[in-house]
Each structure stands twice: as structure tokens, then as C-alpha cells.
């Protein structure tokens, strides 16, 4: 099952994002309903979610710095143990896109290459570069949906 912006598959759990990504473990939201994800995001997710993305190789520190939170802030948040609601929201957005890309392309490696390759459809930007804004993330999700459905891009 796939999860896209504004749409959660019938089971309505974060667990359904992607079996391979284990998004629930990465973002600290195991088995949460959509409402639970909203509440957890508002309270601030554990910093361990960012650490897992780094450890898994899905994002580099430079990418986290650019699209989730600055390095200096990450260092500060490690001491506190939790992200702010805004940082948590960015983390959820990134995890959702990573999971959708891995689901669409069938592997972490293929998804990683696609996310980092500039494309004309995104006016020469790489999909990963678009994730620093909500609208950019929506555009990437729309593109993934078109690819997944075999529509020309």
C-alpha cells in the first residue's frame, strides 16, 4: 500500500508506508493512526528518527541539514531528545516521500538514485531538493504517483 499527501491507505497506519523503509520505526510512530501521527508530530518526535535516517543511509548529514533541520540544531536537539513540531512535520514529510519512492522503484538504491537525479519535470531540480517545502514535496508526490501509474512524465 502506498501513502501520498492527503491520502492514507485503508489500514490507516503509518506502518503501511513501506515494509522496506519501516517508516514507523524511523520516525518513532509505530502503528500510529493518522490522528496519532498528527498528535505525535505536534508533541515533537524523538530525535532518533533523524538518527535512523542517517544510519540507514537514506539521507546524508548535508541533506538532513538542508531539508529537516540544521546540523547545529540537530546537535542541540540530541541533548533534548525531541524535535520541535515543525521539525517533526518535516521529518514525517521526508519519510513519507522516501517510503513512496522506495515503493515505486522497488529498492532503496533505485529510489535513492532517482531522488538525487535532476529532472526536467521539476525544472532541473532533483526530487530530494524539492522536499524543503510542503509544495515541493507535493510536487514530488504527484510525480511519484504518475510514475507509479505508468503515466508519461
Task: Identify the role of each PLM range.
Residues 1-153:
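Non-transmembrane "mature" sequence context
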Amino acid at each position: 500500500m502506498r501513502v501520498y499527501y492527503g491520502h492514507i491507505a485503508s489500514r490507516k497506519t503509518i506502518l503501511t508506508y513501506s515494509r522496506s523503509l519501516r517508516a514507523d520505526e524511523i520516525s518513532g510512530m509505530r502503528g500510529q493512526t493518522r490522528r496519532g501521527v498528527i498528535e505525535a508530530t505536534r508533541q515533537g518526535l524523538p530525535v532518533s528518527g533523524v538518527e535512523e535516517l542517517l544510519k540507514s543511509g537514506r539521507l546524508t548529514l548535508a541533506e538532513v541539514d538542508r531539508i529537516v533541520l540544521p546540523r547545529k540544531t540537530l546537535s542541540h536537539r540530541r541533548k533534548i531528545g525531541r524535535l520541535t513540531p515543525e521539525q517533526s512535520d518535516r521529518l514525517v514529510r521526508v519519510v513519507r516521500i522516501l517510503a513512496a519512492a522506495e515503493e515505486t522503484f522497488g529498492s532503496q538504491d533505485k529510489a535513492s538514485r532517482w531522488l538525487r537525479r535532476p529532472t526536467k519535470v521539476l525544472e532541473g531540480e532533483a526530487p530530494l531538493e524539492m522536499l524543503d517545502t510542503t509544495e515541493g514535496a507535493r510536487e514530488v508526490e504527484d510525480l511519484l504517483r504518475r510514475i507509479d501509474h505508468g503515466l508519461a512524465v
